[in-house]
Design a protein with these regions (language model features):
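Cleavable N-terminal export/targeting peptides
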Residues: 1-27
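Outer-membrane beta-barrel "beta-signal"
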Residues: 72-74, 142-155, 167-178
Length: 178
């Protein structure tokens, strides 16, 4: 009797919670241009698919006063339901402060994880948390924001972020999908 009830419960659970595979809900082939406030920074980011669920990342930010934060690495992405994606990234940063060196002063690694969710039609909410790892001084990085997708190729966003280098900023961005 218990075996029959277990089989019925398992069948019912499988019928209610289908384990169908979904494609990614967001495009990870994109180019972004951004401007941050307090301190004023300009930056950009490019991501492109390596496989269906992995992508390469390259990003750079600067105050244009002899400084930069350049990062590159690889990330994963995949669906977390019908309207959301989960993603993560492993990056290597080269950070240059105001010194005269040709190459940046510091090399750091970053590991992060985040999610992107369709809140309404053409409105995306996203969040990411990570760690900028240094032997002496590791820092938490985060990004919370919203993005309006005006077309399939163009979206405009506003984020509250701290990338671990420039501190807390309000960032406005334009993203172009390809």
């Amino acid at each position: 009797m218990l075996g029959k009830a277990l089989k019925v419960a398992t069948f019912g659970l499988c019928a209610v919670l289908p384990l169908a595979a979904h494609a990614n809900n967001f495009n990870y082939n994109m180019m972004e241009f951004r401007m941050g406030t307090s301190p004023g920074t300009f930056g950009g980011e490019v991501t492109t698919y390596f496989t269906e669920n992995t992508h390469f990342i390259g990003r750079a930010d600067s105050e244009f006063s002899g400084d930069w934060d350049i990062a590159g690495g690889i990330g994963f992405n995949g669906p977390a339901g019908q309207f959301a994606d989960i993603y993560g990234q492993m990056l290597v940063h080269n950070i240059k402060k105001d010194s005269g060196d040709l190459v940046g002063d510091e090399w750091k690694t970053e590991v992060n994880i985040g999610t992107r969710v369709w809140f309404m039609q053409n409105i995306e909410l996203h969040g990411r948390i990570g760690q900028l790892i240094d032997n002496d001084d590791s820092k938490t990085s985060y990004n919370l924001g919203a993005r309006f997708h005006s077309t399939q190729q163009l979206s405009l966003g506003a984020d509250l972020k701290d990338n671990g280098t420039y501190g807390q900023q309000l960032v406005l961005s334009a993203r172009f999908a390809y």
